[in-house]
Amino acid sequence: MRSAWGYSRGMHPHLLDVFSRLDRSRAALGAAVESIAPALREQRPAPNQWSVAEVLEHLSMVERIFTGRIADAIATARAAGLAEETGDRSPLADAIETRMADRVNRRNAPEVARPTGTLDAAAAWAAVEGGHQRLRALVSDADGLALSGVMLDHPFFGAMTVYQFIELIAAHEGRHTEQITEIGRTLAGSV
């Protein structure tokens, strides 16, 4: 049987929790994009700021990188005999949540996650959606396994579990949802 989110009710509660958060962030992102006229989605609000299409491309790039790292960590853990999930899930640390929500202090994306500007908004959205599908398929395939013990290193935030990495993806998406909302306000004021 499937839940309202389309997930199996037999899915481990830890995975349901993080997937539900990811779905909520995705819905908010979609609403923010839809609130901006399609003709404005490739327009930069200022020369040194990203367009909506570029923000979406960035999100797809980051998710692709994170999904690859999660895939490697799960594969390594499985090869070492990853057991069934019995542990508690530690949520993403409050300090990381706070940092991700901070839109006052600008951050510079690493080179590998900087948008090329070659995708229009529709193609960038499709890339984001495709990335989410790959992430969900990958992690769903490990449903019930001890993902709370599978650790990955983040270059800035340090060691995190698979669940925390998924929450980080949602928090990162939330940060950029706010950015898209800001872009929309700026562009609406310049029309």
Where are the model-predicted features located?
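Acidic/His metal-coordination segments adjacent to aromatic residues that form catalytic metal sites
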Residues: P110-A122, P155-Y163
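Hydrophobic-ligand binding "helix-grip"
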Residues: A121, W125-G130
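An N-terminal domain-cap segment
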Residues: P13-Q49
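A structural motif
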Residues: T98-P110
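Short, contiguous alpha-helical
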Residues: E42-R99, E129, Q133-V191
